[in-house]
Amino acid sequence: MSIASDANEMQGEIARFRHELHQEPEIGLDLPRTQEKVLKALDGLPYEITLGESTTSVTAVLRGGAAHASARKPAVLLRADMDGLPVQERTGVEFSSKIDGAMHACGHDLHTSMLAGAATLLAERRDQLAGDVVLMFQPGEEGFDGAGHMIREGVLDAAGRRVDAAYGMHVFSSLEPYGQFCTKPGVMMSASDGLFVTVLGAGGHGSAPHAAKDPVTAAAEMVTALQVMITRQFNMFDPVVLTVGVLQAGTKRNVIPESARFEATIRTFSEASRERMMTAIPQLLKGIASAHGLEVDVDYRGEYPMTVTDEDETHTAENVISDMFGGSRLSRWATPISGSEDFSRVLAEVPGTFVGLSAVPRGVDHTTSAFNHSPYATFDDGVLSDGAALYAELAVSRIATLAAGN
């Protein structure tokens, strides 16, 4: 039977595993229950297992048993992230989160269950593989740089040498119709940086602002000035997104506080714009503070680089998708999206690509459905077997071409 047929036979099993994961989401780098579930799913399969030291990651290596013509035995990496979000679930599904304040609102439970399904599909084809497969079950994608932790601990060399190609996948609860696969060569997702600003003034009575140094008005001016700077100083065809999500000052309406603070997320799509933001923002904010006779502390933190996919590996994935599911289920995005991913760290080290998969519930309008990270984000189980099949087929197909010297 084909990989797709075998995956369809496993649909119920993969869905049950996904529901188990969904009911017990964990956040960050320490996911002991999730790790235990993954290890149970891999139990009895011929994988070499390595557990993370700084995280509860799982790295599983399958040694292919077929002969290979290449001088160097190829290796391919498949990645799934495993962590949830600090969100109170409001979907109402039967398998809703049992953990207060935690939810798999970004679909990582689907990624993990699909890769676990692919582990079985690949193990059944071990003798056909002329190379090795590295499965990367990663904690801490949601702001904890789990990929960076795993790279530092050697996941890219887990097969005994650097992997030749790497593939990741991400489901969406909106954006595209149900079952649609999405690709984009080159810059696919933005870089993500954090901005943390504290404006330092001198407190006083609200009735006598002249006798104080008001950090609130200066902070408000900074927030609006940042948006003006972007529209005046940056090319509209090389977009920059800056959103202030935290703005805090004071505790009483008639008291001028000593400080005000705000935090922002910054998304860029080129290294030139990213580097320019790193210098332009402190310059602007310090200028405003100086004009008001205040001090300002500007902490600009580089977080994740752009997700840049390899053109050849993207074509490989597109061909596999078209062959397995038909060309009508493949969309190539014309522009990047402003979300960010720490799989970008993997793609900065080895050639690879990232595939989107719409899990919008069937019958729901993808243009109005709740987006990832929403407490109402709902993902359709129906894509699980397709995702597992794609993971497995990507490894099988790419190892075959690499072993043939291509």
Predicted regions mapped to residue ranges:
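Divalent metal-coordination and catalytic microenvironments
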Residues: 21, 60, 78, 108, ...
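Histidine/acidic-residue-rich, glycine-tolerant segments that coordinate divalent metal ions
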Residues: 85-87, 91-103, 109-110, 122-246, ...
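Structural motif
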Residues: 74-77, 132-134, 163-167, 220, ...
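General structural feature for long, well-ordered alpha-helical segments within catalytic domains
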Residues: 10-17, 30-41, 74, 102, ...
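Metal-dependent amide/peptide-bond hydrolase catalytic core
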Residues: 220-406
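Acidic/His- and Gly-rich active-site-bordering loop/insert found
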Residues: 1-104, 109, 113-129
